């Protein structure tokens, strides 16, 4: 198998991969973005039909290009996908589509990236696949009555997929709440999960827009390298069972006749059982239970017991030249959001530039000796 040599390989062509590519291109670095999809934004296009971003356009630009919509507009999933395509084209970011990486290893002074019959050797690798690669449902989902229609939120598209009858949505975060409103006109919807709270006010107001920008700028600057930033991220991680509702409020759910119920505890005789002991008779279940890490293809000892990368602001200190981006609370409260992609991408690109200079200096020293 022939091995291609590239200075830097970015694995993943979502918003974090593109933001990283932007800064690498500013350095005029030799790099390539590998993406398993056939075009930019596919992970957005494949979500449910009515999906809009949970934050407005004014807070969702990537470095070098604002989102082309009124600042208070909540972009649709297709608008977000189109933005990513336009962004990559504007900055002429080098990408190879349809490349699913099977294995990442380290050999001698290089990382080896294997994708089918293709293999690349790189001095730097940025894993930009994020942390949420695999849809997760509890094991007892398989115990539900076979007649119960089940979808994970990643597979849900619109109400026409579901049977007549009641719907239980498991997970009361932003996705669960949005899907509940999508289904409420045609079904009795029960939304299971703890109240995650919500961001009060209206994004349409000037004051709220200004407040959102102030929060975003503070969140970007209060990284884990600051005392207050470390405290905020520690608190957020401890609470990381659900994000505050942004576009949807409890009032919206009440007005749509969505019934809030406790968390799901298990299954009894094929029926879902709530924490308060109630057994539900529903025809459909939508799992808005999120995703889990899937880094099994990375054959390197860089993970903790829970399978999370061990890093500082995305830099893996035990494997020089390896980086992660898009992880929850990677450096700040907004690291896994579109709005936070730029600051983490710049930090990593700057680290790559610094390491490249160091490697070049060492090489020159070796040749001179």
Segments (PLM) and residue ranges:
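Flavin (primarily FAD) cofactor-binding/catalytic cores of flavoenzymes
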Residues: 2-13, 18-37, 41-43, 72-369
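Redox-cofactor-proximal catalytic regions of oxidoreductases
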Residues: 39-64
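A short small-residue
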Residues: 62-66, 326-328
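A short acidic, helix-capping loop that chelates divalent metal ions and anchors anionic groups
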Residues: 66-72
């Amino acid at each position: 198998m022939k091995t291609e040599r590239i200075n830097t390989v970015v694995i993943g062509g979502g918003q974090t991969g593109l933001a990283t590519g932007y800064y690498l291109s500013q350095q005029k670095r030799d790099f390539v973005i590998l993406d398993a999809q056939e075009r930019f934004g596919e992970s957005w296009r494949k979500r449910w039909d009515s999906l809009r971003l949970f934050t407005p356009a004014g807070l969702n630009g990537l470095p070098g290009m604002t989102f082309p919509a009124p600042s208070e507009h909540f972009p649709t999933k297709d608008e977000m996908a189109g933005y990513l395509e336009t962004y990559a084209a504007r900055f002429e970011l080098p990408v190879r589509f349809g490349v699913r990486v099977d294995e990442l290893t380290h050999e001698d002074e290089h990382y080896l990236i294997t994708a089918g019959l293709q293999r690349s050797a790189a001095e730097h690798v940025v894993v930009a696949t994020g942390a949420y690669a695999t849809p997760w449902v509890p094991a007892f989902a398989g115990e539900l009555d076979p007649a119960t229609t089940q979808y994970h939120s990643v597979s849900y598209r619109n109400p026409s997929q579901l049977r007549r009858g009641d719907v239980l949505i498991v997970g009361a975060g932003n996705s669960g709440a949005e899907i509940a409103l999508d289904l409420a006109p045609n079904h009795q919807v029960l939304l299971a999960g703890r109240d995650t709270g919500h961001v009060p006010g209206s994004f349409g107001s000037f004051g709220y827009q200004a407040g959102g920008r102030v929060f975003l700028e503070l969140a970007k600057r209060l990284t884990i390298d600051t005392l207050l930033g470390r405290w905020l991220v520690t608190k957020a991680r401890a609470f990381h069972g659900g994000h505050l509702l942004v576009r949807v409020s409890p009032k919206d759910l009440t007005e749509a006749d969505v019934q809030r119920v406790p968390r799901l505890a298990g299954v009894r005789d094929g029926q879902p059982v709530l924490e308060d002991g109630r057994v539900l008779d529903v025809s459909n279940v939508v799992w808005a239970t999120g995703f889990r890490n899937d880094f099994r293809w990375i054959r390197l000892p860089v993970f903790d017991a829970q399978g999370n990368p061990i890093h500082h602001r995305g830099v893996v200190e035990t494997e020089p030249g390896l980086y992660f981006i898009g992880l929850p609370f990677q450096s700040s409260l907004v690291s896994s959001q579109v709005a936070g992609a730029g600051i983490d991408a710049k930090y990593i690109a700057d680290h790559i530039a610094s390491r490249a200079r160091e490697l070049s200096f060492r090489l020159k020293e070796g040749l001179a000796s």
